[in-house]
């Protein structure tokens, strides 16, 4: 085990994340301005494409971090049969779910059942497709719909809060199936679709457009919310949720419905709205 991986295990994840949350929501201008200036400089954040490009106008760091983009900064792929990329970031991995397993990194994988919280939830995705998108601190942190879908259920799976940076992904076995996450099940024109919002070290929350804050509160058991019959439909490219700090979103598709855009591969930089896959 490398020193970096050992430190990843040793860090007090929840304490650090709780502290990060307090700082992110602080309206003390000395705190918010220092955090905004530090992150903007360190990660070369492009504020020109923000709906509000003035860093001094954000009352808290969290307002800055979850900032909206100006109209037209991202557009959906013109092909109406394209499923679109759900977020800005980088492809961590993508491919086929083989024997129920999802590839994480060299020598590392986890099962779809572990990720989703049950064998039953994973069955529709056997031999289907997965795409894992990592959002770095410099990226736009709202997650959008790859395809039009009606919300069926969410599953809050408690877990750890390991970093989801490249070193941790390479060094921590089954990382995405161990971190706290919100599994969002949708019914679409081609069948079921899942978007999984994975929490991480210093992630101070996940919010959805239909329910507000979902993570925290931190729990000790799997919590399901049934939305069937409530008519919560989100259009292709519409905002679905947001991270209150950088993390990862994983999209699962059932078998036989789509093929990934050929230019995509591990480590590909991606933007919200570009083609992720095309329906067959």
Swiss-Prot record:
Subcellular localization(s) per the UniProt record: Cell membrane
Positions of modified residues (Pyruvic acid (Ser)): 247
Segments passing through the bilayer: none
Site note Cleavage (non-hydrolytic), residues: 246-247
Topology class, membrane: Peripheral membrane protein
Keywords: Cell membrane, Decarboxylase, Lipid biosynthesis, Lipid metabolism, Lyase, Membrane, Phospholipid biosynthesis, Phospholipid metabolism, Pyruvate, Zymogen
Reaction equation(s) it catalyzes: a 1,2-diacyl-sn-glycero-3-phospho-L-serine + H(+) = a 1,2-diacyl-sn-glycero-3-phosphoethanolamine + CO2
Pathway of action: Phospholipid metabolism; phosphatidylethanolamine biosynthesis; phosphatidylethanolamine from CDP-diacylglycerol: step 2/2
InterPro entries in alphabetical order: PS_Dcarbxylase, PSD-B, PSD_type1_pro
Post-translational modification: Is synthesized initially as an inactive proenzyme. Formation of the active enzyme involves a self-maturation process in which the active site pyruvoyl group is generated from an internal serine residue via an autocatalytic post-translational modification. Two non-identical subunits are generated from the proenzyme in this reaction, and the pyruvate is formed at the N-terminus of the alpha chain, which is derived from the carboxyl end of the proenzyme.
Co-factor binding comment: Binds 1 pyruvoyl group covalently per subunit.
Catalytic residues as annotated in Swiss-Prot or TrEMBL: 88, 144, 247
Known role: Catalyzes the formation of phosphatidylethanolamine (PtdEtn) from phosphatidylserine (PtdSer).
Subunit structure: Heterodimer of a large membrane-associated beta subunit and a small pyruvoyl-containing alpha subunit.
Protein name as catalogued: Phosphatidylserine decarboxylase proenzyme
Source species of the chain: Stenotrophomonas maltophilia (strain R551-3)
